[in-house]
Amino acid sequence: MRALFSVSDKTGVVEFASQLVELGWEIIATGGTMKLLQDAGLKVINISEITGFPEICDGRVKTLHPKVHGGLLGRRDLESHIAQLKENGIEFIDMVCVNLYPFKQTIANPDVTMEDAIENIDIGGPSMLRSAAKNWSAVTVVCNPENYAKIISEIRETGNTTKETRLQLSAEAYTHTAEYDMMIATYMRKAAGLNEKLFLEYDLKQSLRYGENPHQSAKFYATLDTVPYSLATAEQLTGKELSYNNIQDANAALNIAREFDAPFCVGLKHMNPCGAAIGTDVVDAWKKAYEADKVSIFGGIVAVNREINKEVAELMKPIFLEIIMAPSFTDEALEVLRTKKNLRLLKVDMSKEQGGHNMYVSMNGGILVQEQDIETKTVTADMCVTEVKPCECQLTDLDFAWRIVKHVKSNAIVVVKDGATLGVGAGQMNRVGSAKIALEQAEAALKEVGKDIKAEGLVLGSDGFFPFDDTVTLAAEYGVKAIVQPGGSMRDADSVNKANECGITMLCTGMRHFKH
């Protein structure tokens, strides 16, 4: 049995080749791989001894030869193939261990030149992988060091890899070369100024019971790159499988949680926050978020950016929740929450750098692509456009409102007091309609605890500008004292004048946050 080695990623290759030699395999290798194995004391056949031809063109041509590809592609079950190979002095090759030049890593360098990129386009490697993968019934093709141990184990047990394993490895090899070619094609088309083509690469993570509704099928695919605050990398500690709607809502909750450094909690339903708050600690944040809307949070999803301890777990336990997400749970908290068998507990890494990614929306005949709305401006006093200026406590609430309203379906209005939402108006076709919903919710919440809304000096946030002054007029009727909005309307002056007339401070951020 003969194995051909030509690897860029040297991880575990010496041990793998050594074990094959112990099992009676001959090792053939190219250039740097051959030197590495020989330095480790292994007997290695130079590929040039097989081809009878030296490496040429600075190593660009090494394995592109009939004695390599004939040995890989020749069928062991066809006498005509066997005869042709024998006639031409070609021996079978039973395994190929190849991974490709690091093209992805090369072009990730912002200073990469075209020459650097070109020299890291592998030609012989993909050719060998494809030839070996085509003849998978007889040839083992290895492109991932993670498979080395499994291959050695099977050879020890049966003398060769199983047919099932070879088929799986063949599929992996074709996937590897397809991904490689997609990267090269994307780079070269951009360099040539050609029309962009979009290649998407995701792995199936989970087949879901159904989609948004029971009559819709659904699957969850995950990106190959690690994404911070990601459901794809979350560890589920308890509970039944996540549903399509669970994943949508949980992702929305995590995107809100990433906005805050202070202890924060959000309850969410149908991708809109129903209660959100910052607090002195996780218990305080939970209490404020829960009190914000005790009705809507029923059956909702909760995300917390601090460890869940026993105290907050006991407060959450009586409430029917679908999911609780946090960076960690104490053992005592897990003991409390595990008694609710259907409650899903997700441990999510929230410590990584907050990066953005592209968002895709499917439609008939195509998809829309946009960058994630990751940037949020910190609300500062110099954004004020009215005669009345904000105090420090108002600035804190204005910034909180601005970070929350960004994640509410447009038209979006939130009403805030002391670092907590009191009302959320989402998805209405006119802005004043959303404002009315949010203000009525806030009034009801305050009335429940014996407070008058007009005496509280509330803060209002809007994801879009005010086309008319009607939203400011309505806000003033409910006692709102500070407003944050993007600005940019042709009638901004009307809203500013109305705010001045009503003694309201208004800040314009210059950044809109529509969410459809």
Residue ranges and their predicted role:
Residues 27, 44, 139-141, 345, ...:
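Hydrophobic beta-strand scaffold residues
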